[in-house]
């Protein structure tokens, strides 16, 4: 059931009231939201579902990550400067702002400097400035230090917890009047009769696993807006539908992804070097696998350790989680971790398609910002500053149209907002003039060149980086989508992994417990299998159940059923919302949909 609203860790309850038309008003200084939810509960699963209650905003933003919150903050800054008032709402499926955020992370403060120039004075949690970069090529037992590539230099950048930065951004947004609602999972895009986006709906709560309504059933809400900004992060569940409805990917290449698996450790003080940034290529990944590791020495003797595995791999027996365990047994890494304590674990997919995989960004009534659109600099292993910049640009493009429509309605004394869709074409136009576009275009050939192998890819990447600087007349292709890359199990060699030692390496369930993930068990499974027979005939019989290995949370298992054949079991309570299954399933037979709001991981300083 829904909980009262506790924003960004504070004991602040958002207040609402019912208008004469029985619609929600989220604003402050009204009666308690919880009492209104009580008024729309229903006590029998046999009752016909009523219409959703609704509310009207100027802008609704889906996702309280760096892109969504930057959009909200810039809109409020522009409103204040112009003496206007815009009602801006941010909905977040995590239990609090930041609870679903996982990143390395080393942050380039360029976009933050633009958004909030006095961020230091306001206490932004950018604490550890990078002091040294190191770059290694690893073999099974050795490490060869190489010159750090130009684009991987981190002078002036900060080792951060992106979750903590996002929590701080949420506080800044709220202080400016942005309405931020965690535990609200956007489950549906709403459309006007003319096909334009008119907002989103949150999912119903209190539906039992068998589909019946519990005594705590609560209808979802419609959040209508002049403009809806989708900032869902990598592989957004609503964004997938928008790609198809508005043909947003017709003129770009398929996106390609990586799976990032991360642990935070507290290590011995004598082994800690605050401000040190290490990136590696090579071991534990074989030459045909794309990816690499990162080791970031943050404050308080903590180290952020992670491995990114390209999801365009072909061997269905590959297990990214086990590859990460292998990394920790490398002498350079193991020596650092010995005597330390693993504090947190998590996983999340990352866009790696780059420049050639960026979709169309605007459509009637809406826009895409940040990682949901694929803005990640692969060589730099960074995306948060791009997320923030795209949010800033989207807000600046939208603001004049929002105010113009608002003023027009006031002149005509309209009671209801206009249904004329906003189309903020200025956003992609300004983006193409920005440093984001320039930088992504410059490195567009780096990721696809690695398909030639690690060493040839590094040589070509060096030529691109130092000689051509992105000015080559060609653009390399990312090739087939990741889900089409797997080879049949019969053509591949099984991979044997060592048992965990419980000190440096861990069994999967021990790690999952460190993520804090949790879901209401009595709810429909949110990982939908469209056709279970396809899963059996393709996933099980041809690829030997790859979802049991590519999932970094142990959600999927093939277990012997009553008829003696293996059946697919989904332990969705363990789900980390990483979206790997949605991406890598060979026939795109698995769909990630949002569970009840507030479910999923509860990442702390990840």
Swiss-Prot record:
Its cofactor is [4Fe-4S] cluster; FAD. The chain crosses the membrane at residues 448-468. Disulfide bonds: none annotated. Its EC number is 1.5.5.1. FAD binds at residues 59-73. It catalyses: a ubiquinone + reduced [electron-transfer flavoprotein] = a ubiquinol + oxidized [electron-transfer flavoprotein] + H(+). Pfam families: ETFQO_UQ-bd (PF21162), Fer4_ETF_QO (PF05187), NAD_binding_8 (PF13450). It is an enzyme of class 1 (oxidoreductase). The keyword tRNA-binding does not apply. One of its GO terms (biological process) is electron transport chain. Keywords: 4Fe-4S, Electron transport, FAD, Flavoprotein, Iron, Iron-sulfur, Membrane, Metal-binding, Mitochondrion, Mitochondrion inner membrane, Oxidoreductase, Transit peptide, Transmembrane, Transmembrane helix, Transport, Ubiquinone. The keyword Transmembrane helix applies. It is found in: Mitochondrion inner membrane. GO terms for cellular component: mitochondrial inner membrane. [4Fe-4S] cluster binds at residues 551, 575, 578, 581. It comes from the Eukaryota. Binds 1 [4Fe-4S] cluster. Monomer. Belongs to the ETF-QO/FixC family. Accepts electrons from ETF and reduces ubiquinone. This is Electron transfer flavoprotein-ubiquinone oxidoreductase, mitochondrial. It comes from Dictyostelium discoideum. The lineage of its organism: Eukaryota, Amoebozoa, Evosea, Eumycetozoa, Dictyostelia.
């Amino acid at each position: 059931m829904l909980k009262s609203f506790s924003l960004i860790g504070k004991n602040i309850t958002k207040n609402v009231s019912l208008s004469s038309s029985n619609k929600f008003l989220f604003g402050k200084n009204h009666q308690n939201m919880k009492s209104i939810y009580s008024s729309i509960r229903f006590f029998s699963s046999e009752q016909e579902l009523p219409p959703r209650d609704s509310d009207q905003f100027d802008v609704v933003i889906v996702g309280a990550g760096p892109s969504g919150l930057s959009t909200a903050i810039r809109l409020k800054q522009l409103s204040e400067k112009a003496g206007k008032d815009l009602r801006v709402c941010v909905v977040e499926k995590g239990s609090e702002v930041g609870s679903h955020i996982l990143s390395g992370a080393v942050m380039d403060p360029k976009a933050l400097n633009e958004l909030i120039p006095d961020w230091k004075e306001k206490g932004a949690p950018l604490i550890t400035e990078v002091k040294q970069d190191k770059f290694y090529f690893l073999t099974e037992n050795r490490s060869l230090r190489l010159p750090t590539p130009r684009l991987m230099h981190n002078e002036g950048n900060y080792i951060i917890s992106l979750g903590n930065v996002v929590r701080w951004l949420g506080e800044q947004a709220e202080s400016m009047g942005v309405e931020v609602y965690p535990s609200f999972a956007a489950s549906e895009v709403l459309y006007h009769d003319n096909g334009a986006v008119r907002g989103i709906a949150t999912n119903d709560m209190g539906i039992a696993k068998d589909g019946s309504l519990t005594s705590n059933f609560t209808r979802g809400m419609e959040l209508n807006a002049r403009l809806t900004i989708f900032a869902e992060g990598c592989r957004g569940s609503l964004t997938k539908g928008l790609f198809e409805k508005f043909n947003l990917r017709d003129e770009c290449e398929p996106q390609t992804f990586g799976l990032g698996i991360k642990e935070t450790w507290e290590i011995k003080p004598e082994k800690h070097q605050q401000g040190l940034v290490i990136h590696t290529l090579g071991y534990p990944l074989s030459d045909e696998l794309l990816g690499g590791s990162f080791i970031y020495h943050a404050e308080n003797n903590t180290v952020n350790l992670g491995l990114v595995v390209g999801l365009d791999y072909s061997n269905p027996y590959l297990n990214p989680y086990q590859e990460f365990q292998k990394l920790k047994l490398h002498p350079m890494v193991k020596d650092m971790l010995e005597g330390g304590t693993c504090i947190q674990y998590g996983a999340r997919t990352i866009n790696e398609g780059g420049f050639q995989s960026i979709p169309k960004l605007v459509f009637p009534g809406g826009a895409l910002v940040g990682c949901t659109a694929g803005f990640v600099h692969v060589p730099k292993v960074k995306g948060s500053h791009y997320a923030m910049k795209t949010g800033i640009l989207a807000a600046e493009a939208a603001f004049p149209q929002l105010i113009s429509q608002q003023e027009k309605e006031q002149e005509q004394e309209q009671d209801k907002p206009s249904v004329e869709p906003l189309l903020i074409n200025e956003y992609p136009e300004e983006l193409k003039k920005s440093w984001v576009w320039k930088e992504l275009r410059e490195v567009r050939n780096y990721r696809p060149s690695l398909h030639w192998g690690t060493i040839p890819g590094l040589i070509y990447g060096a030529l691109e980086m130092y000689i051509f600087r992105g000015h080559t007349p060609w653009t390399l292709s990312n090739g087939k989508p990741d889900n089409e890359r797997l080879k049949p199990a019969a053509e591949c060699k099984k991979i044997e992994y060592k048992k965990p030692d419980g000190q440096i390496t861990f069994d999967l369930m021990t790690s999952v417990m460190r993520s804090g993930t949790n879901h209401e068990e009595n709810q429909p499974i949110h990982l939908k299998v469209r056709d279970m027979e396809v899963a059996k005939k393709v996933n099980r019989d041809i690829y030997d159940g790859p979802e049991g290995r590519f999932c970094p949370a142990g959600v999927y298992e093939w277990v012997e059923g009553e008829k003696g054949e293996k059946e697919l079991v989904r332990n969705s309570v363990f789900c980390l919302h990483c979206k790997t299954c949605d991406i890598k399933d060979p026939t795109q037979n698995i769909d990630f949909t949002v569970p009840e709001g507030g479910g999923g991981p509860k990442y702390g300083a990840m």
